[in-house]
Amino acid sequence: MTRPLSYFHLHLISDATGETLLAAGRAAAAQYANARAIEHIYPLIRTEKQLRKVLEGIDAEPGIVLYTVVDQKLAAIIDESCADMGVPSVSVLEPVLNTFQSYLGAPAHRRASAQHVLNADYFRRIDALNFMMEHDDGQLPLDIEEADVIIVGISRTSKTPTSIYLANRGIKAANVPLVLGIPVPEILFAAKRPLIVGLVATAERISQIRQNRPIGNIPSLDTGLYTDRVSISEELAYARNLCNRHGWPIIDVSRRSIEETAAAILALLRNGKKEGSSS
């Protein structure tokens, strides 16, 4: 018998943007199929006054409290207040900081939002995001050779969201749609530096996605053909043949999240893999 779905409050307190905390909280919550977290996110909490207001909200809607607050005084207030309310509190970063301190033999500086300083890495990500927007959906200016990776695939194989995710990691990504009957831009075959990767999925999966999303700029397909599984299978065969012919690695995204697809591409980049394969 299937257990009924239950809901719980998940409070996330951060002295920075909260992105790290949110990722950790969602990763943990995903392990519980019959429970759904009602997320309460409190970013940029850096004063006791701000924190006290947050704690009032937690008292009104008790639940698990996760926090990334480097100020030890504020961290102590969180732990003490949560203990008084009878709710669990966990410092997500503290075990990691303790391990670093033990290994490096030096204490952490404990600066809020230290990972978000405007350094070279930050500007590299901004540059990659701008590059991605200029090279999305088949836009291939003459500077395509600057790309780290070019993603190809038929419609609805998550090319654009994967490109955005990679750009957020500082990777310059372009993407090109493969449409049956429409020639692939010649500039793609001339590219020497970028890793070119093909994304595919099952016809069933793509049909399901296409039925729930508009066609967009697909001039050679009407609505019926766009969602028809037989037609999609032909598109996929064309895409696979093209990738195999040119030695481009193929990644099946049918059961992959955007993050997992991006991780597979990052692994290919890291290994310098340019031979045709399927994963």
From Swiss-Prot:
Q: Which reaction does it catalyse?
A: N(tele)-phospho-L-histidyl/L-threonyl-[pyruvate, phosphate dikinase] + ADP = N(tele)-phospho-L-histidyl/O-phospho-L-threonyl-[pyruvate, phosphate dikinase] + AMP + H(+); N(tele)-phospho-L-histidyl/O-phospho-L-threonyl-[pyruvate, phosphate dikinase] + phosphate + H(+) = N(tele)-phospho-L-histidyl/L-threonyl-[pyruvate, phosphate dikinase] + diphosphate
Q: Which InterPro entries does the record cross-reference, listed alphabetically?
A: Kinase-pyrophosphorylase, PPDK_reg
Identify one Pfam family in the record. Kinase-PPPase
The yes or no answer to whether the keyword Kinase is present is: yes
Per UniProt, ADP binds at 153-160
Gene Ontology MF term list: ADP binding; ATP binding; phosphotransferase activity, phosphate group as acceptor; protein serine/threonine kinase activity
UniProt keyword terms in alphabetical order: Kinase, Nucleotide-binding, Serine/threonine-protein kinase, Transferase
* EC number(s) on file: 2.7.11.32, 2.7.4.27
Q: Does the keyword Nucleotide-binding apply?
A: yes
The superkingdom listed in its UniProt entry is Bacteria
Q: What class of enzyme is it?
A: transferase
Query: What is this protein's function?
Result: Bifunctional serine/threonine kinase and phosphorylase involved in the regulation of the pyruvate, phosphate dikinase (PPDK) by catalyzing its phosphorylation/dephosphorylation.
Checking HAMAP family in the record gives: PDRP (MF_00921)
The record's comment on protein family reads: Belongs to the pyruvate, phosphate/water dikinase regulatory protein family. PDRP subfamily.
> What's the protein called, per UniProt?
Putative pyruvate, phosphate dikinase regulatory protein
Report the source organism. Answer: Brucella melitensis biotype 2 (strain ATCC 23457)
